[in-house]
């Protein structure tokens, strides 16, 4: 899959943000000339003091004071939240001699989709943090004495004859294995292990369940270590992991449940070790032996219109609503200047055009086309009053005028929150307008591609204005919305449906411009995001991924974090179930059918939500509309009557869109 339309390198006007952090504190100087990740799995390592933990499967890892702490986390669960608990099971450092000066902070010397390398220059330590590695790998670059401390008590401590493997057991039941590329002499007290000066590679792994049957496996694969890994999008609906490895033997890594599902679809020369299991908040991780993985998802074909078509007898009802919705369009009456809400209004109007096309009712199209031009062009031309798109060179990306001086402005867009959400709505409008008016599309193509590349750039060498795949995480196979904010539980994402919509909209833009690589990339990420949504956000009755008390009480996630599962929303409490359903459905579009293809689950979700609509104090009509839309998947007539009685709609939705949805459901 070649990078998308690399001949366009338009950037919006440059600005100097007053709220963005300085990346030079933690990235090595050779990385600073390239765009930098803003929503990545290691983001906490480059924010504030860089000392907040990150979850790098299967360990929580924390860097502070020239030491690196490793935790194989325990887990706490209730009906409201699940989270992994950080306890520094092992802390690795090189004691500072008086001549070395004070301890230094870590530096990131390299990073990739699947790895990050943390250097401690003052200690001669370099950690290869590779996602899914059961081993923590550290390179000691010059002869250096080491210290490994624990908050537990060391109950037993032994080595092999050559002093290249050590086994230690703690009083919390954990057993850890340490491997060295050359003999190392270790001594220990109750809670500290020390070495003489050593240089070479050390690998440390938890022995799962302290079960000796796994020890032979970890021994066998201990010599071959990965230093980096990249996800390659070579063909549609496929992502390939390739690792750079060193030393002899085969490479052992760990796969989460979605990996295993997609590995079985691919043409793989890998061996899955189902008995080797590590616990994870994303489900059990199992061993996989192989230098590269091929993950394949089922093909998903994006469409402008509904998949099965609108029932003929319902055309008149939809046309009546459509005429009224189009009649009320007036760009001069829009009061919001926020990029998110403005984008939703654009996408709402674009839906009206596509529904008119599907109904073969062209009368309303000219008015909607003019509305789209009047609302989109000022953002592309930089003439919008009160806000606009600007370019930040420090990290490499689009920020808004509001966001350049206010970290909370535009929901944190200026610190790289929610980029795929906001920009996805604009891209949807641009795609539809380009479909209607190809000449308009050609005129604004540079700006359109600049917007899409902000979160869909595959190659920073071909387009150095934007980081690689800003929001989509190729290891967990879904996106992160949280940007440059330090969070104890890492990155997070609330609305999966808006993430899906962003990639879907990009694929539609590819269709509008005749850009096959963009169609392929957008469709592939759409399909993967949907797989991730179904795996981790949709909580099915009787599911075993999460604890029983959580699964019994919930049918859909609130906010999903790298290290936590939360039922609450950013904007509403967990009890507002209609909001939890709605934020995982909006914006309602043809792709919604693929997200909610499991009718049995849809029924479970709606029946779980419906009692909340009788809540004292009332429920917003806009949220009710989304609940009724999903009810229409299995009870069309009941949902239709409820939708006809609605008195209001979400800002990105309309009566026309809800009627289109209900009347395009299959009777099967």
From Swiss-Prot:
Cleaves internal linkages in 1,3-beta-glucan. Beta-glucan, a polysaccharide constituent of fungal cell walls, can act as an elicitor in the plant, triggering defense responses including phytoalexin synthesis. It is an enzyme of class 3 (hydrolase). Residues 2-208 are annotated as: beta-sandwich subdomain. The keyword Secreted applies. Its main location: secreted. The record marks 7, 636 as: Not glycosylated. Expressed in roots (at protein level). Expressed in leaves. Residues 309-668 are annotated as: (alpha/beta)6 barrel subdomain. It is found in: Secreted, Cell wall. One of its GO terms (molecular function) is glucan endo-1,3-beta-D-glucosidase activity. InterPro entries: Endo-beta-glucanase (IPR005200), GH81_C (IPR040720), GH81_N (IPR040451). The gene is GBP. Keywords: Carbohydrate metabolism, Cell wall, Cell wall biogenesis/degradation, Glycoprotein, Glycosidase, Hydrolase, Polysaccharide degradation, Secreted. Residues 240-443 are annotated as: Involved in beta-glucan binding. (1,3-beta-D-glucosyl)n binds at residues 422, 494, 498. GO terms for biological process: cell wall organization; cell wall polysaccharide catabolic process; detection of symbiotic fungus. This is Glucan endo-1,3-beta-D-glucosidase. Belongs to the glycosyl hydrolase 81 family. The active site is at residues 418, 494, 498. It comes from the Eukaryota. Glycans are attached at residues 65, 124, 160, 187, 465. Residues 2-668 form the GH81 domain. It comes from Glycine max (Soybean). Its EC number is 3.2.1.39.
